[in-house]
Curated annotation (Swiss-Prot):
Annotated binding of ATP, by residue: 144-152, 167
Annotated region described as Required for interaction with TAB2, given as residue ranges: 1-304, 434-527
Motif (TQE): 298-300
UniProt enzyme class: transferase
Active-site residues (renumbered): 264
PANTHER family: MITOGEN-ACTIVATED PROTEIN KINASE
Modified residues (Phosphoserine): 522
Residues covered by the Protein kinase domain: 138-427
Gene Ontology cellular-component terms listed: cytoplasm; cytosol; nucleoplasm; nucleus
Cited InterPro entries: Kinase-like_dom_sf, MAP_kinase, MAP_kinase_CS, Prot_kinase_dom, Protein_kinase_ATP_BS, Ser/Thr_kinase_AS
Gene: NLK
Catalytic activity: L-seryl-[protein] + ATP = O-phospho-L-seryl-[protein] + ADP + H(+); L-threonyl-[protein] + ATP = O-phospho-L-threonyl-[protein] + ADP + H(+)
Protein name according to UniProt: Serine/threonine-protein kinase NLK
Organism of provenance: Homo sapiens (Human)
Length: 527
């Protein structure tokens, strides 16, 4: 994983400070100095095509050519039975499942319709599909990760041969709460338009509503995540740290401008590709900020090590400052290559925080519950020990520690915002490097680099969650989500659907969701 070189560029800094676009003077220099390569060790095979597959083995996905003879159709059906993703028909929706129409996940379908599913590809084709023989040396699908609520697989999009990620949102319609949560995440993934925030490229065609149990979302495939990089033995330069932190805050500024709290920022939810481009992912716990302080918010959020003190202390109302606390913990972890506050329990978590920050004032604890305040006041009075942050690593410079101390503030109202953190001088080099050779918003010409007028864009309008207020039954939400997915189908692209007969799909459908360690944390009950 390498970073390209970036020279200090006066015009770019002028563009940032003045808010105007600028072209770099002179030619853009191309002697790029490559930083240590950080390949994700156990994901290395993403870069290498696997051994050739034959029809009938678990090939990833297949488009199917329009059949001209019954023999060709039979061959196509055999190949498609192995493929997990297939281009669907343009109008596959009927009042009830039509003969030969795949009803969707095999697990949800009656046996006789499962048998008909094998004939799906034979029954409906689309003229934009390619010849199946072109696609036979595709890597098999494989699981690549588990989120708060869902499992992610890498697959090949049969329409263009690109590797993409496929996220299964399972058990969507168990109850009204899970329906609303999944619909919220789905709407967010379709709303996001930012290079440092993962968004939906596509949603697989749903089956007829009677068989509609799972939702499959296609997103960009990223090679690694910050957790894997931090625990790897490869060195992380200060340039890596700056460009990662810059992108985390750039994505967070966008999310917060949309009025969204992520509520589970941790290294494993920060995806990184081989060029060091970073994207915030997993919005299973995200929600719109609650401006009415009298309304209670759930405390079952944020993985413990990254949980802000106000949540640990049982505050019933919190702000997007909880995400900034998590970023501070990650910043320290990037510098020190170990978890900053690694406690066995939520109470010990709070004690480790006060060891570093000192005993908080009553004002800083004003939103805490009485039991948590009593715990702090019972204990010894602690002095802050912030200078210990300089011992994280040689990269913990004055500028780095200064910014870190603005993030790790006990009182959420005094914690720095994503917008203000981006203006900190520590991130100037990260911004320069990102916009000189990593971003999609600036471009190079023969006379130099043309910079965007807005380095850290926000969204307008905000994400609107008023749709949730009127959701009253599982059946109603199911119909609304089904309709929403149909409306999302991107223009004239061939819609994709799951092939429930493929071996890969059967493995996918049975893969477990969220390992026990990944489950959302339980709330701390203060006596």
């Amino acid at each position: 994983m390498s970073l390209c070189g970036a020279r200090a560029n006066a015009k770019m800094m002028a563009a940032y400070n003045g808010g105007t676009s600028a072209a770099a003077a002179g030619h853009h220099h191309h002697h790029h100095h490559h930083l240590p390569h950080l390949p994700p060790p156990h994901l290395h095979h993403h870069h290498h095509p696997q051994h050739h597959l034959h029809p009938g083995s678990a090939a990833a996905v297949h488009p199917v050519q329009q059949h001209t003879s019954s023999a060709a159709a039979a061959a196509a059906a055999a190949a498609a039975a192995a493929a997990m993703l297939n281009p669907g028909q343009q109008q596959p929706y009927f009042p009830s499942p039509a003969p030969g129409q795949a009803p969707g996940p095999a697990a949800a379908a009656p046996a006789q319709v499962q048998a008909a599913a094998a004939a799906t590809v034979k029954a409906h084709h689309h003229q934009h599909s390619h010849h199946p023989q072109q696609q036979l040396d595709i890597e098999p699908d494989r699981p690549i990760g588990y989120g708060a609520f869902g499992v992610v697989w890498s697959v090949t999009d049969p329409r263009d041969g690109k590797r993409v990620a496929l996220k299964k949102m399972p058990n969507v319609f168990q109850n009204l709460v899970s329906c609303k949560r999944v619909f919220r995440e789905l709407k967010m993934l379709c709303f996001f338009k930012h290079d440092n925030v993962l968004s939906a490229l596509d949603i697989l065609q749903p089956p007829h509503i009677d068989y509609f149990e799972e939702i499959y979302v296609v997103t960009e495939l990223m090679q690694s995540d910050l957790h894997k990089i931090i625990v790897s033995p490869q060195p992380l330069s200060s340039d890596h740290v700056k460009v990662f932190l810059y992108q985390i805050l750039r994505g967070l500024k966008y999310l917060h401008s949309a009025g969204i709290l992520h509520r589970d920022i941790k290294p494993g939810n920060l995806l990184v590709n081989s060029n060091c481009v970073l994207k915030i992912c997993d919005f299973g716990l995200a929600r719109v900020e609650e401006l009415d302080e009298s309304r209670h918010m759930t405390q079952e959020v944020v993985t413990q090590y990254y949980r802000a003190p106000e949540i640990l202390m049982g505050s019933r109302h919190y702000s997007n400052a909880i995400d900034i606390w998590s970023v501070g913990c990650i910043f320290a972890e990037l510098l020190g290559r170990r978890i900053l506050f690694q406690a066995q329990s939520p109470i010990q978590q709070l004690d480790l925080i006060t060891d570093l920050l000192g005993t908080p004032s009553l004002e800083a604890m004003r939103t805490a519950c009485e039991g948590a305040k009593a715990h702090i006041l019972r204990g010894p009075h602690k002095q802050p020990s912030l200078p210990v942050l300089y011992t994280l690593s040689s990269q913990a410079t004055h500028e780095a520690v200064h910014l870190l101390c603005r993030m790790l503030v006990f009182d959420p109202s005094k914690r720095i915002s994503a917008k203000d953190a981006l203006a900190h001088p520590y991130l100037d080099e990260g911004r320069l490097r990102y916009h000189t050779c990593m971003c999609k918003c600036c471009f190079s010409t023969s006379t130099g680099r043309v910079y965007t007028s807005d380095f850290e864009p926000v969204t307008n309008p905000k994400f609107d969650d008023t749709f949730e207020k009127n959701l009253s039954s599982v059946r109603q939400v199911k119909e609304i989500i089904h309709q929403f997915i149909l409306e999302q189908q991107k223009g004239n692209r061939v819609p994709l659907c799951i092939n429930p007969q493929s071996a890969a799909f059967k493995s996918f459908i049975s893969s477990t969701v969220a390992q026990p360690s990944e489950m959302p944390p339980s709330p701390l009950v203060w006596e």
